[in-house]
C-alpha cells in the first residue's frame, strides 16, 4: 500500500529535532582529535569531532531534507533552517577548517574510515537544497585523483560555490590517500563485511564527485585497481550467503544488493552485476529487512530507486568468478597454536 499520507511526519520531525539537540554526534569511543590518543571524557561542543557516526548522521539529515523538503516547509520554514545550521556547524565547518586523521596526510596509512566519512560528507553537502543551483556552476577539478594541482574556481563565484569547490577538492584528495594504500588486486584487508564500508563507500564518493562535476571522474571507473576493488566481493564469494572469511569478518557477510550492482555497472563488469542481482533476488529485494545496510537512509533510497531494475534481471546465467579463486593446501602438518 502506498504511503506518503503524512502520518509519519510528526515522528520524523521528532527524530530530527532529537538528533539536532544531541550534544555531540560522535561515538564516545571516538571522542579525540588525534589518532590513537585517549578519548576525552566529554565532548567539546565548540570543536565537533568528525567520526564515522557524526558523518553518517549528517548524511541522514541531508537525505531527510532532500526527500521531504516540501513537506517540512509546509509545516515550518524553520525545520530546514535547523537542519542546515546543524550541518554547517557540525560537518561542513569542521571539515573545511580542521584536520582529522582519516582525511589523509603524506604517507599516513588510511582505512575504510577515509571513504566512509568522505562519502557521507559529500552526501551532506550535495543533497541539501543549498547546493542544487550552485553545484551546476562548479568547475571540474584539475587534478584527477593524482598530483597536487590547485582547482580552478569559476569567476564571480558566491561564497557557497567557493565552499562547495573546497569540499570537492578535499574529498577528491582523501580518495587519493585511500587508494594509495589499496593493493592493485583490490583486496579488502578487513574482509567481505568491510567491503561495504571500503570499496562501496569509494564507489559512493566517486559517484557524487562524478555527478556534480558533469562526469569528470568517469574514466576512473575504468582503472584496473578500481575495477578490482569492485569485483573483490565476487572473488571471495563461496556459495549462497557464504564468503571466505579472515581478519574479524564473519563467513556470513550479508547479501549483496543495489550498491554492488551499481558498482558493477559503473566499472563495466557483467559478472558482478549478475552476482549482485542474483543475491538481491535471493534476499527478496531487501526492502523490509536489510541485514547489510540497516537503517542507512541513503542506501535505502538507492534500493528503492533501483529495486525494479534488479528484480527484473535475468539471473539464470552462470558466474565465472570461481575460476579466479586458488586455494592452496597448507604445508604445515599441525595447526598453529
What are the roles of these predicted feature ranges?
Residues 1-137, 145-237:
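Aromatic-lined, polymer-binding surfaces characteristic
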Residues 152-153, 197-324, 328, 333, ...:
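Carbohydrate-active enzyme catalytic cores, enriched for enzymes
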